[in-house]
């Protein structure tokens, strides 16, 4: 029997904001209720996320009981995730909360979900199978990211600890039977054609047949057209049947980040970097506040849910219209304000147990005893893990105008171009390239540019620290960039490099380059719950012409040529005789070339969501919509560090210093009327990185190459943190935060009237092209293959026209509801035609 899964893929914010798409949800559910009332055995997969229901009920709470009834009867299949986040860009706690909240929601609605439905996420992290197992998720349906030498619909996906999940690879995409009711005469031919195309990739004999599409509000029952030839299924039922019919299936280990069969869009790692920077800071504050709140049995779930909505793949990847991303900035600012207030309130409560004085609030589990400089002050940090620790000693000022520094870990001196020699390497080199890509994909070429110093001077110096101010100007044709940089030296092995970049111009890539002169060292990158080893270049991709069998199923965009840009969260390291790491906060795209240059991509300036004919990508990626905010013209802050150690990248010694960079101490002043109290409050310590609070305990994992504290390498577990607060004589304390996480401020240029005129000119060109195709169609027989090819072209041109028209309205400050709905309908019609043309191509041969 042929199993068909009916579903929708709900891009709640992409070419239209959720304020618009939420209105469409009501329409979807009205139709679903009607369909199920007529066909009680109908099943519908709600995109594997419970956020859709949250959105629906926020607008139409009267649906709640009906929805619960559908879930409990098995007609509506929800979860197990809360939202379809981007796993490459989301921080560790958010990834955990996304599963936790999803499973909780499913339970509250009376459902059950043990198979993840992730049909359009832009790749997956290595430890997801282990996380899924922790939450009772046994399988997954995937499309993007899969890297199999020989494609197979059924495979096992394994984490480093040995945990695995059963997977269904949707090699033909998630919409191969979509819109049968709109192609009634071809319905049975489409079914037969899809089965014929896909069965060669199936080990079980079953092929995934999916009736659904993006923002589909018209659910259909394919049995009306295909009768007894098919049976409606669910993700769980399909998975069980497929694996019951197979004895041996291929196993894939680790990350799924390949664009071999479907794009994972590496360019999205650096699109609208200002969003990534703000998301990082808000994510850190959530983690800190949740920990402090847990000591008093308080939860911050609603704040986390608001945050998770910004991590949905189209949102955090920056591939939506400007309206959406401007709203994200407002959400981040509001979240940060609420968290900052809560953070201070929790510190005030903790401060009642302390004496008056200065304290370092530490969120790193490691112990430190060295002079630490935060860019304003240099003090002796004596911490014993996570807690509050008294600060008694500050560095003494001295006179020294030399642009060099030496400690137990390195010798450093500045060069005339503003770059810095640190032992054997050169860092702080700024590189500018011409960017030819779009919001989805990066394509760069060399360009002529100049970089000169406008200021370089010592700002502060002591016995144990030095702060150097550096200002540079970068210029190229149509581009002007000014930087204000603060380079911080202290007793640690970290050289901290903070930058404020003021940019004007477009279509460029600005990178922070560290020259290691190591052409053969191994490359490692910090990713959620793991340190992964990667090749410098990924060439395991298919050519433009993948051959007849693959061409017939790979109808969507995929990467071709080679991939040089990869994701990271925290650091990129080269390991040879020593470990050299470049660390960054809220910046996620890197490249390591054949000579050993580590490039951290800071700003990638583009102005279209998706363009045609971007090098390195084949197929249709997304809408041709003008998004001037993606040029990143304005002011953006960055925080980086360079560290070289005689230690393995997967060692406690290395993570001790990375943790200091990623979770630096916050200096606070405590003032009480009496002087009773402690000089420290220690919550916990150790060498295992902690993630978040999970069911009242602390989730930790072992990133090291050897067992530690009873955990095998790569294994996750929880530890109980028992914090007992002593009685204090004074229940009031004033707290002043002297140095904390700073919210990245942004200021962008407004669109000009000339740019709007250029957009109108593009619209006129497309209108002329539409007229030409319509004339061609008049001379063709409607039953000919050429007619359908040209009809496909006409639908593509009309879609482009609507995309540009919606862009024009949005850039004039309007939200064109009617046009957005029309665009959604035209996108669906055009997508159906992909399969019609491919089907008829077989007959034309």
Regions from the PLM with identified roles:
Residues 33-36, 225-775, 807-809, 815-826, ...:
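Terminal accessory/anchoring regions of large secretory-pathway or extracellular enzymes
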Residues 28-31, 58-70, 97-98, 148-161, ...:
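Alpha-helical scaffolding within the catalytic cores
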Residues 86-105, 173-198:
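Alpha-helical scaffold elements lining the catalytic groove of polysaccharide deacetylases
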Residues 95-134, 192-210:
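CE4/NodB-like, metal-dependent polysaccharide N-deacetylase domain
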Residues 67-68, 126-177:
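Surface-exposed loop and adjacent secondary-structure segments within mature catalytic domains
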């Amino acid at each position: 029997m042929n199993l068909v899964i009916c579903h929708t893929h709900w891009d709640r914010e992409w070419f239209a904001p959720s304020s618009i798409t939420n209105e469409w949800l009501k329409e979807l559910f009205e139709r679903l209720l009607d369909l199920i009332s007529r066909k009680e055995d109908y099943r519908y997969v709600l995109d594997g996320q419970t956020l859709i229901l949250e959105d629906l009920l926020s607008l139409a709470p009267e649906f709640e009981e009906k929805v619960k009834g559908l879930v409990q009867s098995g007609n509506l299949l929800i979860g197990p995730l809360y939202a379809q986040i981007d796993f490459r860009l989301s921080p560790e706690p958010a990834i955990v909360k996304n599963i936790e909240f999803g499973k909780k929601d499913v339970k509250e609605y009376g459902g059950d979900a043990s198979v993840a439905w992730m049909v359009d996420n832009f790749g997956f992290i290595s430890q997801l199978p282990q996380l899924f197992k922790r939450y009772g998720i046994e399988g997954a349906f995937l499309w993007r990211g899969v890297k199999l030498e020989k494609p197979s619909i059924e495979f096992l996906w394994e984490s480093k600890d040995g945990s695995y999940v059963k997977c269904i690879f949707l090699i033909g995409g998630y919409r191969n039977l979509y819109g049968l009711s709109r192609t009634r005469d071809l319905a049975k031919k489409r079914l037969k054609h899809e089965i014929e195309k896909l069965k060669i990739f199936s080990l079980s004999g079953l092929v995934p047949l999916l009736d659904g599409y993006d923002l589909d509000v018209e659910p259909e029952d394919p049995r009306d057209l295909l009768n007894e030839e098919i049976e409606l299924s669910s993700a769980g039922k399909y998975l069980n049947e497929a694996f019951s019919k197979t004895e041996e299936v291929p196993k894939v280990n680790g990350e799924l980040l390949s664009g071999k069969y479907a794009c994972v869009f590496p360019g999205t790692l650096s699109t609208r970097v200002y969003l990534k920077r703000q998301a990082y800071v808000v994510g850190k504050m959530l983690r800190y506040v949740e920990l402090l709140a847990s000591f008093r049995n308080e939860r911050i779930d609603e704040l986390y849910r608001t945050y998770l909505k910004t991590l949905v793949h189209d949102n955090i990847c920056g591939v939506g219209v400007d309206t959406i991303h401007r709203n994200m900035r407002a959400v981040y600012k509001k979240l940060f304000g609420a968290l900052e207030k809560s953070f201070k309130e929790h510190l005030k409560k903790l401060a009642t147990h302390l004496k008056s004085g200065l304290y370092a609030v530490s969120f790193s589990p490691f112990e430190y005893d060295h002079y630490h400089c935060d860019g304003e002050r240099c003090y002796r940090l004596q911490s014993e893990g996570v807690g509050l620790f008294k600060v008694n000693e500050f560095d003494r000022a001295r006179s020294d105008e030399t642009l060099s520094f030496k400690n137990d870990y390195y010798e450093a001196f500045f060069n005339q171009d503003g770059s810095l020699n640190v032992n054997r390497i050169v860092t702080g080199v700024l590189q500018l390239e011409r960017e030819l890509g779009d919001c989805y994909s990066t394509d760069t070429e060399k360009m002529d540019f100049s970089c000169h110093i406008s200021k370089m001077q010592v700002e502060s110096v002591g016995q144990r620290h030095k702060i150097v101010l550096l200002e540079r100007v970068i210029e190229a044709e149509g581009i002007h960039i000014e930087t204000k940089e603060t380079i911080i030296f202290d007793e640690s092995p970290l050289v901290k490099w903070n930058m404020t970049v003021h940019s004007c111009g477009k279509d460029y890539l600005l990178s922070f380059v560290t020259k290691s002169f190591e052409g053969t060292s191994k490359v490692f990158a910090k990713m959620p719950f793991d340190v992964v080893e990667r090749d410098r270049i990924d060439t395991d991709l298919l050519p433009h012409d993948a051959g007849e069998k693959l061409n017939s199923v790979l109808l969507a965009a995929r990467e071709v040529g080679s991939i040089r840009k990869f994701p990271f969260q925290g650091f990129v390291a080269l390991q040879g005789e020593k470990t050299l790491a470049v660390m960054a906060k809220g910046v996620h795209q890197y490249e390591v070339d054949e000579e050993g240059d580590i490039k951290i991509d800071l700003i990638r300036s583009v102005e279209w969501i998706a363009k045609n004919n971007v090098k390195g990508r084949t197929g249709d990626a997304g809408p041709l919509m003008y998004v001037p905010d993606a040029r990143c013209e304005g002011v953006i802050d960055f925080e980086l560090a360079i560290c070289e150690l005689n230690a393995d990248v997967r060692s406690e010694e290395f993570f001790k210093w990375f943790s200091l960079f990623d979770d630096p101490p916050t200096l606070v002043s405590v003032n009480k009327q009496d002087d009773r109290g402690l000089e420290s409050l220690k919550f916990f310590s150790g060498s295992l990185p902690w993630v978040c609070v999970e069911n009242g305990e602390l989730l930790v994992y072992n990133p090291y190459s050897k067992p530690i504290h009873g955990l095998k390498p790569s294994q996750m577990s929880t530890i109980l943190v028992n914090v007992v607060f002593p009685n204090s004589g004074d229940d009031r304390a004033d707290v002043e935060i002297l140095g904390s996480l700073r919210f990245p401020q942004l200021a962008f240029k407004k669109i000009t009237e000339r740019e709007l005129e250029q957009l109108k000119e593009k619209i006129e060109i497309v209108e002329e092209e539409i007229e030409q195709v319509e004339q061609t169609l008049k001379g063709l027989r409607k039953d000919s293959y050429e007619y359908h090819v040209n009809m496909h072209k006409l639908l593509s041109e009309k879609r482009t026209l609507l995309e540009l028209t919606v862009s024009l309205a949005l850039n004039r400050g309007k939200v064109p509801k009617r046009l957005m709905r029309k665009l959604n309908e035209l996108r669906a019609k055009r997508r159906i035609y992909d399969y019609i043309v491919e089907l008829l191509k077989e007959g034309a041969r």
